[in-house]
Swiss-Prot record:
GO cellular component: chloroplast stroma; chloroplast thylakoid
Enzyme Commission number(s) from the entry: 1.13.11.12
Gene transcribed to yield this protein: LOX3.1
Name of this chain's protein: Linoleate 13S-lipoxygenase 3-1, chloroplastic
Residues that coordinate or bind Fe cation: H574, H579, H765, N769, I914
Organism: Solanum tuberosum (Potato)
Domain of life: Eukaryota
Note: Depletion of LOX-H3 by co-suppression-mediated gene silencing leads to higher tuber yield, but has no effect on the number of tubers per plant.
Induction trigger: Up-regulated locally and systemically 30 minutes after wounding. Up-regulated by jasmonate and abscisic acid treatment. Not induced by pathogen infection.
SMART domains: LH2 (SM00308)
Chain's role: Plant lipoxygenases may be involved in a number of diverse aspects of plant physiology including growth and development, pest resistance, and senescence or responses to wounding. Required for the regulation of wound-induced gene expression, but is not involved in the bulk production of jasmonate upon wounding. Catalyzes the hydroperoxidation of lipids containing a cis,cis-1,4-pentadiene structure. Linolenic acid is the preferred substrate, before linoleic and arachidonic acids.
Length: 914
């Protein structure tokens, strides 16, 4: 505990005591203060141990305090001075208006239009029947320091309080300036308990726009029924303010969290081609809720919300917006540069004469030579854009050069090999679709009356020659057969997809065989189309080639599998399962959990930026005619596929162990470190993921057990229960009646729910996101869409295919424009920002909580994450693990916790922040 005490500031008492001397007033001397009160201050500040000890202690010490107050306070209360150190973060860049207003605020600050603070005690004032308050203190030297160019500026303010004031539990801030400012933290010095920290990290709006005082609580956590009397009303008021009243159009400066359906993806006022179905609020099209903005409806469809088109920002609560360094990396710079400037330049530069890649050299030239932009489009404006790192340079001669994706870094031709195609199913950007094949042949779950026979076209003879002498049943029994099955996801949409101009798709199934050395090989691909008649041929099976024609057919079939997989990865596993499904949990947390609630403090870093990135996605990525529709096979039906998948989403199976068991990739085994035995021992995503899952679970268990020693505390925590109930009944209302929702009645229930949420926000999202450019930036390896089917021998195109199979192959891949647009966008989405906060890290790691035992537990968790990173490095150097180490094999680093900025193909941020 010595370390923790030093961290929490107890050892600073002597250093801060000199500040308490003043010639103008009587001093409060901690050494002369009654021992009982001094003890109470210090022990209240220390970490909690268990509920019964805390309550017993509080009863005895409060009795002592009450006795002392009766005897001493009326006659001997003394006044003393305490100081606030207030840290404000400056903007690096200001526009002309902001600069003018900043100077105006500096001038008017001198004449009373300033920033004032007021301390609120944890104790009640018996006279006012409200919390004890200090005098209002003015932030000093704002005008003098307004021109400082440093990232942070420290201001001070002085308060006068009585010796019976108690502990400061909250502080109010009033901004009488014309402009908002970012308040990072406040530290109060001069109390007997030592420095009191107030982590703020919030924009404080001008009083003229938001009349109420802003409330900030100290870092001391309190469960609702343990809230000190002086803070109870403030706790409730702050939550009411954050909930709002559900009415009106939200202003960008608002801090209101509320729910709405996805009714803002289309723009019917632009025409029927831009209208899109509403997602959510319909049993046929269920979807999680998103953050409400309250915009007026469109003119054409009153149920559709009008859009805010780029570059204007869409609403998210002010504190959810990207901080400046993140903005410069992503929001206003990178993605907008790509969407508004680079892509139009590409569209204007790529004529119909060079619509397709002519060969592999054309793709290679994007990295080695660059793309020639049309004259005039690159001029000074384009040259000054903060384009993604992938766009390395715009040189003289109008060249736009892309960085070489990591998939080409070790072996330029690795992507062509079947073993690499299979390896990416367990160690690529979408390692969560593969399943154990439970029976052969596989069977569809779709309605046969609508979609035809459920039976697969796969037969034993298709795969028997690839089973190393086993029968199919023997291979099944030996856990040797695996499948990536996208049949039921795509088949209901194929008629509509294939009617789109330049889009062609199958519903695919791919069978893999596990070799004796632990690697996979693809042994059959089934390609299905909707049945057009009772005797029509709607399914075909392609197997590894034995001739030249078969080789090209096999390559195109694998490309169709990759396009299917890219769509499922982006629309279901990535967007739906880690972005959209988490948003209701985040909205409910802000609405129902006080900032002083220990569970809010635990979840806070794992909610950072998610609402902003989701809002930006609705505006520019998943919207009608947006990047996702333009770049992926389903086109305008992308989000309908996502909504169809939501019908099968289950929160109780989103944790890693449950997901692995659901997919048959692991079986329970109490003798194994994580209670699971992997069927593929060298399954990099699962093997590394289980280590991280275990570390998160251990940290959450320590945390939860510290505050909830029994089920009674869980059940009686009204804020906690309201958070979970609102998440289900409002945020995921379309699935609220499902029986699989976990209960929240015991500490173990809470541990499971929180571990799953933190896993999804951190490691699961990282595994699915940061490999997008490293693997998908080379389009032949992972085409996001396909434009041609494989011709049958009776098709007129078959002769064209035979005459020039390479040309046919490239004509089936995305066009040059589609590919370059996709490459630029996924590079941006694969990028870490400089201010990224990784798993095991926290902003202000020593002061985010006032609970010393929890600080120590967090450092223990952080150390375990560091140990896991070293273990991952060792695994990537182990030649026995052939799915992550070998000639030309990429190491699996997507779950390596730390990373530098940029596109690194590694790093696990705390939250879904891109």
């Amino acid at each position: 505990m010595a370390l923790a005490k030093e961290i929490m500031g107890i050892s600073l008492l002597e250093k801060s005591s000199s500040f308490m001397n003043s010639s103008s007033m009587a001093l409060f001397n901690p050494n002369n203060y009654h021992k009982e009160n001094h003890l109470w201050f210090n022990q209240q500040f220390q970490g909690r141990r268990n509920l019964s000890r805390r309550k017993a202690f509080r009863q005895s010490t409060m009795a002592a305090i009450s006795e002392n107050l009766i005897k001493v306070v009326p006659e001997k209360a003394v006044r003393f001075k305490v100081r606030a150190v207030v840290t404000v973060r400056n903007k690096n860049k200001e526009d002309l208006k902001e600069t003018i207003v900043k100077h105006l605020d500096a001038f008017t600050d001198k004449i009373g239009r300033n920033v004032t603070l007021e301390l609120i005690s944890t104790d009640m004032d018996p006279n006012t029947k409200g919390p004890k308050k200090s005098n209002q203190a003015v932030l000093k030297d704002w005008s003098k320091k307004s021109n400082l160019k440093t990232e942070r500026v420290n201001y001070t303010a002085e308060f006068i309080v009585d010796s019976n004031f108690g502990n400061p539990g909250a502080i109010t801030v009033t901004n009488k300036h014309q402009q908002e400012f970012f308040l990072e933290s406040i530290t109060i010095e001069g109390f007997a308990c030592g420095p009191v920290h107030f982590p703020c990290n919030s924009w404080v709006q001008p009083k003229k726009d938001h009349p109420g005082k802003r409330i900030f609580f100290s870092n001391q956590p309190y469960l609702p029924d343990e809230t000190p009397a002086g803070l109870k009303s403030l706790r409730e008021r702050e939550l009411r303010d954050l909930r709002g009243d559900g009415k009106g159009v939200r202003k960008l400066s608002d801090r209101i969290y509320d729910y709405d359906i996805y009714n803002d993806l289309g723009n019917p006022d632009k025409g029927i081609d831009f209208a899109r179905p509403k997602l959510g609020g319909d049993d046929n099209v269920p979807y999680p809720r998103r953050c409400r903005s309250g915009r007026v409806p469109t003119d054409t469809d009153i149920s559709a919300e009008s859009r805010v088109e780029k570059p204007n920002p869409t609403y998210v609560p002010r504190d959810e917006q990207f901080e400046e360094s993140k903005m410069n990396t992503f929001s206003t710079s990178r993605l907008k540069a790509v969407l508004h400037n680079l892509i139009p330049s590409l569209m204007a530069s790529i004529s119909s004469n060079n619509h397709d890649f002519k060969g592999f050299s054309d793709i290679d030239n994007l990295y080695s030579k660059g793309l020639l932009l049309k004259l005039g489009l690159q001029d000074e404006v384009l040259k000054k854009l903060p384009l993604p790192k992938v766009v390395s340079s715009i040189k003289e001669g109008d060249l736009l050069k892309y960085d070489t994706p990591k998939i080409l870094s070790k072996d330029k031709f690795a992507w062509l090999r079947d073993d690499e195609f299979a390896r990416q199913a367990i160690a690529g950007v979408n390692p969560v679709s593969i399943e154990k094949l439970q029976f052969f042949p596989p069977v569809s779950k779709l309605d046969p009356e609508i979609y035809g026979p459920q039976e697969s076209a796969l037969k034993e003879e298709h795969i028997l020659g690839h089973l190393n002498g086993m029968t199919v049943q023997e291979a099944l029994d030996a856990n040797k057969l695996f499948i990536v099955d996208h049949h039921d996801v795509y088949l209901p949409f194929l008629d509509r997809i294939n009617a789109l101009d330049g889009r062609k798709a199958y519903a695919t199934r791919t069978i893999f065989f596990l070799s004796d050395v632990g690697t996979l090989k693809p042994i059959a691909i089934e390609l299905s189309l909707p049945q057009t008649g009772p005797s029509s041929r709607s399914k075909r099976v392609v197997t590894p080639p034995v001739c030249a024609t078969g080789n090209w057919t096999w390559q195109i079939a694998k490309a169709h599998v990759c396009a299917n997989d890219a769509g499922v990865h982006q629309l279901v596993n990535h967007w739906l399962r880690t972005h959209a499904s988490l948003e209701p949990f985040i909205l409910a947390a802000h609405r129902q959990l006080s900032a002083m609630h220990p569970i809010y403090k635990l979840l806070d870093p794992h909610m950072r930026y998610t609402l902003e990135i989701n809002g930006l996605a609705r505006q520019s990525l998943i919207n009608a005619d947006g990047v996702i529709e333009a770049c992926f096979t389903p086109g305008r039906y992308c989000m309908e596929i996502s909504a169809a998948a939501y019908k099968n989403w289950r929160f109780d199976l989103e944790g890693l162990p449950a997901d692995l068991i659901r997919r048959g990739m692991a079986v329970p085994d109490s003798t194994q470190p994580h209670g699971l035995k992997l069927l593929i021992e060298d399954y990099p995503y699962a093997a590394d993921g289980l280590m991280i899952w275990g570390a998160i679970e251990s940290w959450v268990r320590d945390y939860v057990n510290h505050y909830y020693p029994s089920s009674a505390q869980v059940c009686s925590d009204r804020e906690l229960q309201a958070w979970y109930a609102e998440t289900i009944n409002v945020g995921h209302v379309d699935l609220r009646n499902e029986e699989w929702w976990p209960t929240l009645a015991t500490p173990e229930d809470l541990i499971s729910i929180l571990t799953t949420l933190i896993w999804l926000a951190s490691a699961q999202h990282a595994a699915l996101n940061f490999g997008q450019y490293p693997y998908g930036g080379y389009v032949p390896n992972r085409p996001p869409l396909m434009r041609r089917l494989i011709p049958d021998e009776n098709d007129p195109e078959y002769a064209v295919f035979l005459a020039d199979p390479q040309k046919y192959f490239f004509s089936a891949l995305p066009s040059l424009l589609q590919a370059t647009k996709f490459m630029a966008v996924v590079d941006t989405l694969s990028t870490h920002s400089p201010d990224e906060e990784y798993l095991g890290e926290r902003h202000q790691p020593s002061t985010w909580t006032g609970d010393a035992e929890i600080v120590e537990a967090f450092y223990k968790f952080s150390a375990e994450i560091g140990r896991i990173e070293k273990e991952i490095d060792e695994r990537n150097a182990n030649t026995k693990l052939k799915n992550r180490c070998g000639a030309g094999v990429l190491p699996y680093e997507l779950l390596a916790p730390s990373s530098g900025p940029g596109v690194t193909c590694r790093g696990v941020p705390n939250s879904v922040s891109i």
